[in-house]
A protein has these predicted regions:
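Canonical positions in the second alpha-helix
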Residues: 79-80, 115-116, 150-152, 187-188
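Terminal, low-structured helical/coil segments at or just beyond the last alpha-helical repeat
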Residues: 194-239
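Hydrophobic face of amphipathic alpha-helices that form TPR/SEL1-like repeat modules
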Residues: 57-64, 75-80, 89-98, 125-134, ...
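N-terminal Lys/Arg-rich, disordered targeting/topogenic segments
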Residues: 1-16
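N-terminal Sec-pathway targeting helices
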Residues: 13-27
């Protein structure tokens, strides 16, 4: 270990400033009081979550759902859904559709999905599109299916875009349109849908060279509209 060079001036020690110590102690006291308050609220209301922020409500409910604690999940989602929280309405619809923690009730599930979809929750729009397309809970309604799938697709959902491509290819509720079928399938493929590539290739075989160029241009037009819909917009699931 080298000794300091005696020729170098030594820096005098920093003077002690009691103000910093007081501020530090103050922060510690505030943190302790906050922790005591939260613990007190939790003890006083062990079955209530109203003292928590909404974002934390949702996080707790979603964790409970994924861990299989359906009773807790339903309780919190129901509280938030009653306050018109669209994300909670979607989750409660999902659980009601499947009968998780609540009696299975297709009509109530659809009503909740529609409330969430009205607030642009993309997952709710997609599920309603699937329900009306496949007749999962109600008789098929291709007009409703197309409307909800378009809403979800224009918010960038690849599965919704793929299903729209199928509808146009098969002519479900409309005349078959290979250009629209290719365009929507291409959009879904570019957005990450693996299955959409098969739909796109199936539509491609029905198009001559000129129509193929038209279909590619239509896909670009759709992508541009999706960009306009999603850029600068708040996350649909939180509206």
């Amino acid at each position: 270990m080298t000794s300091p060079d005696p020729r170098e001036p030594r820096r005098p020690p920093e003077p002690f400033n009691p103000l910093f110590a007081i501020i530090g102690i103050g922060f510690v006291i505030v943190a302790l009081l906050a922790a005591i308050l939260v613990a007190s609220l939790r003890d006083q209301h062990p079955n209530q979550t109203s003292w928590l922020p909404k974002a934390e409500h949702l996080e707790i409910a979603e964790k409970a759902f994924r861990s299989g604690d359906n009773e807790v999940a339903v309780k919190i989602f129901s509280e938030l859904a009653a306050k018109n929280n669209a994300t909670a309405q979607y989750w409660l619809a999902h659980m009601t559709e499947l009968g998780l923690g609540v009696p299975r009730d297709p009509a109530k599930a659809i009503a909740l999905y529609k409330k969430a979809a009205a607030r642009n929750v993309v997952a709710a729009e997609l599920r309603l599109g699937e329900i009306y397309l496949h007749g999962d809970l109600v008789p098929p309604d291709f007009g409703q299916a197309k409307a909800y799938l378009e809403e979800a697709a224009y918010y960038g959902d690849p599965r919704a875009a793929m299903l729209l491509g199928q509808m146009y290819r098969l002519g479900l509720g409309m005349s078959a349109d290979p250009i629209e079928a290719y365009a929507w399938s291409e959009v879904a493929s570019l957005e990450g849908s693996i299955f959409a590539k098969r739909e796109r290739d199936a539509s491609l075989g029905k198009l001559d060279t000129d129509k193929q160029q038209e279909a590619v241009a239509r896909a670009a037009q759709i992508l541009e509209q999706i960009k306009r819909e999603t850029t600068g917009a708040s996350a649909p699931s939180s509206k």
